[in-house]
């Protein structure tokens, strides 16, 4: 075991002297289905999470849904007030495709949906809060899913049409665009697995065919912006990929190679086509999948190839790399292997992962406080992909519903994470901002309301969905204001206020 992994947990008080750049963008993040509610309000169409939670409620741990969630559809002004309380520079949120285009297609634009997001964006800008907008955060219109969703070869065209409508309506004010949030979770958990909607569980090809369709759709939405809107609107467009760090368990060549294969399977499928110099799917992993496919009797690889034209089209389709980061895993070529469906993406990777028991555990079984995790990920990506601009678009910590307002574990996590951010900046990573997940407690997908990530507690039982700041909100507010991480800072009150200028 590598000694630095344990030593890295120690946070030295001298870190408090290091400053974030004055132009570093601090914010928080949310997603439409997780907070908005109003699932059928004012002409909104059904999306895949509406459909799954209504027809298969047992798919959610507590049998809940996002029908009301935090009711941001009616409470968006309170949400912006919370942003002002924290002193945020930016707020990352997603648009509900079905709220804008109820049927998913471009022929029927819902004016009420457009008005809602106009009001939301204008309320932020009134207080100098920069909107960072995600086009797709997992809530596909159900009509498009009925037609095959991401697997339909027309999907990139549908997404391009949607993106164009969004740019036309909001691009005069929105200057930071993200096409997709977390392709791995979309493709593996929704198509290759049965954890997230649409829960197709097509383990052999679902992940791979979804991945190709998604990156093609991303490129089409990117080039629509570049060719038709960028000159007049002056914004930037990227994609957000979940990049947790994969470290070799030992210094052996076998474990180092296993860690690299796991990185390719986890996020390389989505990053390599866009950010690498060669384009296309990761070479080593695609060769593994092809070999196993032939051994399993498939007439061709279960991972589709890009044509030369497609590869060149996708390659370089970005202005920045959005990184959602939460934790790390130690990867072994032989030990700690779990059973996976055969064939599937993780059976193809065929590696084991280990989490040391001394790493602090959150309410989510997959989320621990791993040492210097953000720095490890970002410096690796910087070297691999020729120093793109980065934003941390999600990073956060989960608590159980009864955790209360004194969330010292979340504070410990954020301080460690932000120290790792400073390490990355000092290492030369071109990191422009950090979005904490999340502004408020919300519907946590298949876990319902059993795992909560908010800086603000939400009383989901109250008609008003009352928001109350947790202790971590005050600590994050102080970091934003001072631009330093003071490990000894303790808020003197849990009564929130808005500073002058916000």
Residue ranges and their predicted role:
Residues 1-16:
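Cleavable N-terminal signal peptides of Sec/SRP-targeted secreted and luminal proteins
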Residues 89-96, 130-134:
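Short, well-structured secondary-structure segments
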Residues 61-75:
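Active-site mouth loops of central-metabolism enzymes
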Residues 75-79, 376-377:
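Alpha-helical scaffolding within the catalytic cores
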Residues 17-60, 84, 103-105, 111-502:
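Active-site region of glycoside hydrolase catalytic domains
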Residues 6, 23-25, 73, 90:
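A common structural microfeature
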Residues 80, 92, 121:
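Beta-strand-rich binding-surface signature
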């Amino acid at each position: 075991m590598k000694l630095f992994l344990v030593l890295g947990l120690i946070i030295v008080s001298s870190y408090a002297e290091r400053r974030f750049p004055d132009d570093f963008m601090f914010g928080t993040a949310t997603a439409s289905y997780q907070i908005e509610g109003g699932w059928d309000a004012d002409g909104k169409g059904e999306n895949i999470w509406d459909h799954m939670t209504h027809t298969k409620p047992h798919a959610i741990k507590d049998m809940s849904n996002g029908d009301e969630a935090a009711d941001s559809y009616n409470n968006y002004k309170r949400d912006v007030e919370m942003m002002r309380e924290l002193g945020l520079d930016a707020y990352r949120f997603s648009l509900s495709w079905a709220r804008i285009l109820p049927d998913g297609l471009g022929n029927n634009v819902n004016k009420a949906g457009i008005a809602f997001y106009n009001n939301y964006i204008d309320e932020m800008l009134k207080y100098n809060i920069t909107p960072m907008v995600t086009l797709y955060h997992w809530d596909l219109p159900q009509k498009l899913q009925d037609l095959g969703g991401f697997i339909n070869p027309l999907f990139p065209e549908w997404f391009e049409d949607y993106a164009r409508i969004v740019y036309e309506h909001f691009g005069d004010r929105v200057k930071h665009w993200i096409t997709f949030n977390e392709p791995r979770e979309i493709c593996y958990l929704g198509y290759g697995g049965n954890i997230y909607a649409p829960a197709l569980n097509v383990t052999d090809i679902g992940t791979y065919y979804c991945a190709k369709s998604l990156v093609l759709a991303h490129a089409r939405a990117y080039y629509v912006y570049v060719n038709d809107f960028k000159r007049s609107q002056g914004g930037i467009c990227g994609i957000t990929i979940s990049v947790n760090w994969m470290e070799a368990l030992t210094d052996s060549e076998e474990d180092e190679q296993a860690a690299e294969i796991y990185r390719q399977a986890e996020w390389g499928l989505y990053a390599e086509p866009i950010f690498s110099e060669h384009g296309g799917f990761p070479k080593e992993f695609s060769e593994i999948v092809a070999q196993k496919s032939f051994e399993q009797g498939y007439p061709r690889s279960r991972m589709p190839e890009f044509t030369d034209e497609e590869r060149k089209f996708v390659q370089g389709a970005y202005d920045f790399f959005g990184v959602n980061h939460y934790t790390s895993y130690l990867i072994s070529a032989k030990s700690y292997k779990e059973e996976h469906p055969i064939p599937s993406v993780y059976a193809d990777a065929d590696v084991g992962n280990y989490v040391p028991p001394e790493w602090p555990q959150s309410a989510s079984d997959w989320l621990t406080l791993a040492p210097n995790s953000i720095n490890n990920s970002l410096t690796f990506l910087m070297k691999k992909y020729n120093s793109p601009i980065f934003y941390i678009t999600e990073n956060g910590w989960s608590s159980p519903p009864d955790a209360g307002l004194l969330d010292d574990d979340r504070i410990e996590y954020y301080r460690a994470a932000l120290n790792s951010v400073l390490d990355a900046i000092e290492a030369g990573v071109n990191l422009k901002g950090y979005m904490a997940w999340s502004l408020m407690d919300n519907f946590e997908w298949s876990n319902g309301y059993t795992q909560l990530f908010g800086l603000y507690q939400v009383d989901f039982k109250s008609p008003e969905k009352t928001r109350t700041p947790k202790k971590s909100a005050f600590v994050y507010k102080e970091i934003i204001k001072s631009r330093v991480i003071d490990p000894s800072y303790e808020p003197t009150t849990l009564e929130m206020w808005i500073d002058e200028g916000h």
